[in-house]
């Protein structure tokens, strides 16, 4: 057994196989001095790292932002903080300026409510009947707690409050921090009696609890307007005095008048106006005119010219005559408010008419104020438009920034994808070269199998070559080797050309856009100059120019980024198509090689 191992032929090494193939004139794969011909190994490593992270990293556990750990027992309120946050257990710990000083131990409050169960009642709307079967309420502080069993208020240490500083004992020390009253066991304490002697050392406690009920407004006076009056009252009593409201409106519009306001309250003496109007209407025209002229004219407020005085006297006489004809009612003078100012009507028929010559000036003043108001409104509208334009420009600048950020992210993702496609193309080239080498070695194996079949024939059928065609056989062998060598060179050059084209596509797309687009040149020639852009600006101030420059630059960068993204997309499309064709060729050659290897294996199996 040892002699057999000693004389057994050893398997050739890889270098020996490569040397034998080179001696035979076959192409072999060489790696001179460790030369790395792969240009996109960095992207290959990046893809491997991404794949490893995505497959090895465990899924991130979702955290519950509403969970509060180590603060409440199971089933508690997750929003409640620890008891150290405040004496009352509030998550916003600190003094409550609206608290009534009721603590969790004593359960007292400044409103006189106290609990006999060792803690204040849990619900402000529930009263304890003092029975034995009544369940004690939870020990929580409530400023609205009700007194139980008639117990008087009882002071107890509580959290600090600016309203409670007058109710603390002089000898009382600062209370220790309280625990959560809900976690304390319930206590049942008998009601205690109130003793004045025990409270001598306490200062008076000021009631700072709930505010007292507001006092009702005093009843309306007999002459006042009652908005809740019954429907059987008069129109004027239920809806106010029309004359007074009109006078108030005119005072607000034209300013206060010099003379006292008109008293248009209800006068029982005026209830007989229709009868008086009938008596006046029955008078003859001449007698009525004489009666009006016999009345003394009212004293003029200021000296006037003769013409104005005569006109005023005649006008007043005619107006009084019309009033007498129409019945003399005070409500009939409402139409003359724009021309006359009324005096105080103490008795019927004694109106003090005075012509207001400043009415025109007041009207002009009102018009000027209205024009000024309209101008201010227009200015406000213009300012609002300016603010809207400025806000829109700021939004546009922010939108361009976001678009640039997303474009940069998309470009980075596209570059990584294209780089990984380049690395994939290099690996396809290596696969194709290795497949071509396997095909060549398979041809050598076929030749060796034929030679082995010839050598292993029977000793009674020796193999003798024909000496007459030896030269022809040698020539055919040389032609076959030359032809195989030429085909191998063509295939090798084709593979190299495909690999170079793939590499140039990827590198050209990764280098970016070298020249500015034609559209960019047109826009720069049209709107690039400042004077040309000012025509489309509302207010070309410094801030607006800065915003416009930023928007223009961002749009230029977006245009360049869009061009680069387009080039990346086209390069990826073409690269994927070429790689698909290469994969089809590799699949076809692999199938042919598999069939040839299977056939050669069958031939070797037939050799005995």
Curated annotation (Swiss-Prot):
SUPFAM superfamilies reported in the protein's UniProt record: SNARE fusion complex (SSF58038)
Example GO molecular function: SNAP receptor activity
Keyword Flavoprotein attributed: no
Composition bias type Basic and acidic residues, residue spans: 9-21, 169-183, 241-260
UniProt keyword terms in alphabetical order: Coiled coil, Protein transport, Repeat, Transport
Compositional bias annotation for Acidic residues: 198-215
Gene Ontology CC terms: plasma membrane; SNARE complex
GO BP term, example: vesicle fusion
Gly residues bias (residue ranges): 100-121
InterPro entries: T_SNARE_dom (IPR000727)
Keyword field contains Plastid: no
Region Disordered, residue ranges: 1-23, 50-307, 514-533
Compositional bias segments (type: Low complexity): 54-67, 74-85, 122-134
All residue ranges annotated as the t-SNARE coiled-coil homology domain in the record: 390-452, 545-607
Family from the record: Belongs to the SNAP-25 family.
This protein's name: Protein transport protein SEC9
Name of the coding gene: SEC9
């Amino acid at each position: 057994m040892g002699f057999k191992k000693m004389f057994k032929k050893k398997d050739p090494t890889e270098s020996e196989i490569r040397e034998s193939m080179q001696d035979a004139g076959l192409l072999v794969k060489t790696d001179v001095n460790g030369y790395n011909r792969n240009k996109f190994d960095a992207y290959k490593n990046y893809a491997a790292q991404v794949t490893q992270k995505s497959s090895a990293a465990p899924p991130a556990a979702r955290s519950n932002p509403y969970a509060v750990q180590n603060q409440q027992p199971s089933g508690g309120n997750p929003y409640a903080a620890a008891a150290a946050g405040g004496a009352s257990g509030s998550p916003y710990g600190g003094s409550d300026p609206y608290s009534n000083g009721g603590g969790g131990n004593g359960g007292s409050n400044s409103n006189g409510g106290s609990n006999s169960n060792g803690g204040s009642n849990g619900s402000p709307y529930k009263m304890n009947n003092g029975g034995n079967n009544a369940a004690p309420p939870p020990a929580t502080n409530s400023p609205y707690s009700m007194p139980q069993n008639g117990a008087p208020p009882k002071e107890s240490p509580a959290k600090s409050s600016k309203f409670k500083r007058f109710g603390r004992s002089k000898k009382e020390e600062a209370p220790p921090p309280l625990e959560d009253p809900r976690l304390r066991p319930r206590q049942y304490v008998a009601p205690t009696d109130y003793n004045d002697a025990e409270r001598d050392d306490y200062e008076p406690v000021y009631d700072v609890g709930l505010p007292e009920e507001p006092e009702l407004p005093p009843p309306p006076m007999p002459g006042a307007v009652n908005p809740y009056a019954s429907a059987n009252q008069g129109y004027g009593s239920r809806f106010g005095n029309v004359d007074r409201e009109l006078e108030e409106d005119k005072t607000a519009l034209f300013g206060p008048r010099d003379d006292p306001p008109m008293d248009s309250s209800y006068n029982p003496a005026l209830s007989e106006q229709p009868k008086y109007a009938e008596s006046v209407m029955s008078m003859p025209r001449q007698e009525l005119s004489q009666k009006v002229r016999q009345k003394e004219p009212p004293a003029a407020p200021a000296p006037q010219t003769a013409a104005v005085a005569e006109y005023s006297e005649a006008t007043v006489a005619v107006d009084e005559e019309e009033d007498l004809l129409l019945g003399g009612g005070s409500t009939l003078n409402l139409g003359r408010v724009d021309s006359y100012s009324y005096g105080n009507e103490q008795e019927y028929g004694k109106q003090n008419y005075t012509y207001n010559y400043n009415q025109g000036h007041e009207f002009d003043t009102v018009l000027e104020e209205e024009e000024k108001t309209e101008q201010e409104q227009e200015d406000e509208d213009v300012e609002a438009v300016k603010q809207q334009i400025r806000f829109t420009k700021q939004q546009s600048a922010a939108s361009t920034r976001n678009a640039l950020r997303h474009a940069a992210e998309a470009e980075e993702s596209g570059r990584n994808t294209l780089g990984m496609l380049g690395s994939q193309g290099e690996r396809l080239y290596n696969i194709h070269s290795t497949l071509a080498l396997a095909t060549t070695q398979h041809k050598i194996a076929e030749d060796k199998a034929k030679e082995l079949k010839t050598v292993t024939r029977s000793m009674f059928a020796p193999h003798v070559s024909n000496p007459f065609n030896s030269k022809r056989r040698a020539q055919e062998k040389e032609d076959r080797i030359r032809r195989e060598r030429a085909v191998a060179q063509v295939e090798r050059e084709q593979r190299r050309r495909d690999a170079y084209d793939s590499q140039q596509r990827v590198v050209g797309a990764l280098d970016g856009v070298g020249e500015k687009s034609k559209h960019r040149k047109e826009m720069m020639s049209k709107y690039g100059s400042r004077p040309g852009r000012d025509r489309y600006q509302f207010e070309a101030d410094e801030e607006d120019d800065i915003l416009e420059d930023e928007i223009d630059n961002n749009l230029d960068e977006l245009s360049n980024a869009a061009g680069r993204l387009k080039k990346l997309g086209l390069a990826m499309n073409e690269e994927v198509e070429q790689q698909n064709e290469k994969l089809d060729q590799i699949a076809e050659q692999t199938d042919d090689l598999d069939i040839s290897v299977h056939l050669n294996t069958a031939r070797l199996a037939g050799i005995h």
